[in-house]
């Protein structure tokens, strides 16, 4: 299975890079992982809604360039569906069983995802109604993908 994580912005903090590297290493036994970073657009203080939408559209265009036609796209979205870890593992397994061996997870920048990206998504997923920094969220997503594979392989993992 091929999994891409397409994310807006670069990870600068060493502790987050270390966690990403650790989960990437752990996931290598279950899937081919590709992490793609697209540049984030600078958001001016007190940006208007129109300015925010333009920024999201620019970031969205960059994101869409990295999504393959055959990808099952899961957009991380505050308005998405919240599911348990077991349901998340079922979602990944259902992709595999229905011939979608390529999954692209998309993490937006500080303003979220553009309508173009949300329209391309096959599934909208929310981890919580809370807002998280998108850099930290990448680590959280990797952990849940790792947990999902452990569940699917019936391997022990802390609860």
From Swiss-Prot:
SUPFAM superfamilies: alpha/beta knot. Its EC number is 2.1.1.177. Gene3D superfamilies: 3.40.1280.10. InterPro entries: Alpha/beta_knot_MTases (IPR029028), RlmH-like (IPR003742), tRNA_m1G_MTases_N (IPR029026). GO terms for molecular function: rRNA (pseudouridine-N3-)-methyltransferase activity. CDD domains: RlmH-like (cd18081). It is an enzyme of class 2 (transferase). This is Ribosomal RNA large subunit methyltransferase H. It comes from Clostridium botulinum (strain 657 / Type Ba4). The lineage of its organism: Bacteria, Bacillati, Bacillota, Clostridia, Eubacteriales.
């Amino acid at each position: 299975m091929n999994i891409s994580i397409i994310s807006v912005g670069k990870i600068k903090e060493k502790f987050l890079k270390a966690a990403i590297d650790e989960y990437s290493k752990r996931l290598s036994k279950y899937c081919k992982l590709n992490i793609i970073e697209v540049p984030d657009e600078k958001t001016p203080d007190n940006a208007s809604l129109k300015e925010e939408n333009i920024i999201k559209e620019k970031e969205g265009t960059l994101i869409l360039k990295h999504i393959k036609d055959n990808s099952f796209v899961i957009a991380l979205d505050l308005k998405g569906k919240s599911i348990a870890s077991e349901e998340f593992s079922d979602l990944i397994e259902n992709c595999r069983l229905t011939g979608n061996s390529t999954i692209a997870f998309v993490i937006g920048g500080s303003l979220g995802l553009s309508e173009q990206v949300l329209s391309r998504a096959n599934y909208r997923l929310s981890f919580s109604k809370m807002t998280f920094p998108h850099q930290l969220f990448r680590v959280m997503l990797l952990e849940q993908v790792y947990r999902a594979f452990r569940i699917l392989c019936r391997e022990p993992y802390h609860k």
